[in-house]
Amino acid sequence: MKDLNHIKHFYFIGVGGIGMSALARYFKAKGNFVAGYDRTSTELTRMLEDENIEVNYEDDITIIPETILNNQENTLIVYTPAVPKDHKQFEFLKKKNFEVVKRAELLGMVTDQKYCLAVAGTHGKTTTTAILGHLLKETGAKVTAFLGGISEDIQSNLIMQGDKVVVVEADEFDRSFLKLSPNLAAITSMDADHLDIYGDKSELEKSFREFAAKVPEDGKLFVKNGLPVNGSSVGINDNSDFSAQNIRIEEGSYVFDLKTPSETIKNLKFNLPGNHNLLNAITALAMAIEYGTSIHDLTRALYSFKGVKRRFSYKIKKDHLVLIDDYAHHPTEISAVHQAVREMYPNKKVLAVFQPHLFSRTRDFAEDFASSLSDFDKVFLLDIYPARELPIEGISSAWLLDKISNTNKALIQKKNLSEMIKTEEAEVVVMMGAGDIGEEVEKVKKALLHEA
């Protein structure tokens, strides 16, 4: 692999992905030529275009920018595992002997010579990474942070405030996180997921243990209390090394004390609802403290954190009507959203709208999906979002709907979604999924506010 310092041109195949777009922004900010392909135009790709990153939406070799084609010696082609094997642009550039790397490899190269803080976990890593990046940024650290979601604080998935320390989301998909060299790391959860890649939970756990082993002796690993990995423990109301104690809700925010191995910090305030988010905050605080950030500065920085888009994002927040958008696509995440909603709105009728993501995940966790969704007052299911997969015979949203014990349920087509939600008169509507349901949220919001 060439030295990254010699690369002046980058072409990202799948540039609209959350991890890819952060890298594209990073190299653009460094003064390089950056362009890319994606299958569809989204809010994120339009933002990239506004930042003078050229994006094309047709898999056609004739529209690859001339700047890329004419500068092979100092050009790098970056791709994700989601790119199909028969992608014409990708195949063409490989045959022309352009240097090609996976996104995870490039992220590994970027972080290799820097002090690296990495957050892994099947759930919680995006929010934890965003909180950690925010804490370091707000306390004056010279930090670059690659986020797996759009921070509500900066409306971006990239923080660039220097390069003394790098914060990254360490993705277990395709074992990507094994390309990283973290100095400090965290594992927020190790629930079974991505079984299409790993086969079974034991292989997934083995991969997390390999990630944990990458932390050097002079570094530190933080783990959620109870996980089968050794490290400094993080928890809520327990005997963890870092634990939230004396938790109460005041004016819609958490107020709590943080017990650390050396002291207890009183009356921290945090604005995101749900025990899962509180645990994310404790993990980020523990890592920031270990990095050497002042406790006093962290208190102020934590309170100012606004959140991550599509992570319990309020789209409407009125006394009689609440619309929440969330990326939850695993039964554990759905249950966490349910806990947060019930904690904030204990006496209100809650409608859950869920778009399953991947046929394989729907099949592998069908009973757990049915159980977690049944806890809501009413459930609307959309068709399964296939992403990288072909259909699996017998696996459908109708099949999943049959397993939901709650009788207040229905299978809904996207074109009818806004009207169906309007007729429900639910006080709280939660829209969940990792597919394109996020694109439907604005339509639903308009319909509920009678703007449609």
From Swiss-Prot:
Enzyme superclass (EC): ligase
BP terms from Gene Ontology: cell division; cell wall organization; peptidoglycan biosynthetic process; regulation of cell shape
Location of the protein in the cell: Cytoplasm
The reaction(s) this protein catalyses: UDP-N-acetyl-alpha-D-muramate + L-alanine + ATP = UDP-N-acetyl-alpha-D-muramoyl-L-alanine + ADP + phosphate + H(+)
EC number(s) per entry: 6.3.2.8
Annotated binding of ATP, by residue: G121, T122, H123, G124, K125, T126, T127
Functional description taken from the UniProt entry: Cell wall formation.
Family indicated by similarity: Belongs to the MurCDEF family.
Name of the molecule in the record: UDP-N-acetylmuramate--L-alanine ligase
Gene that specifies this protein: murC
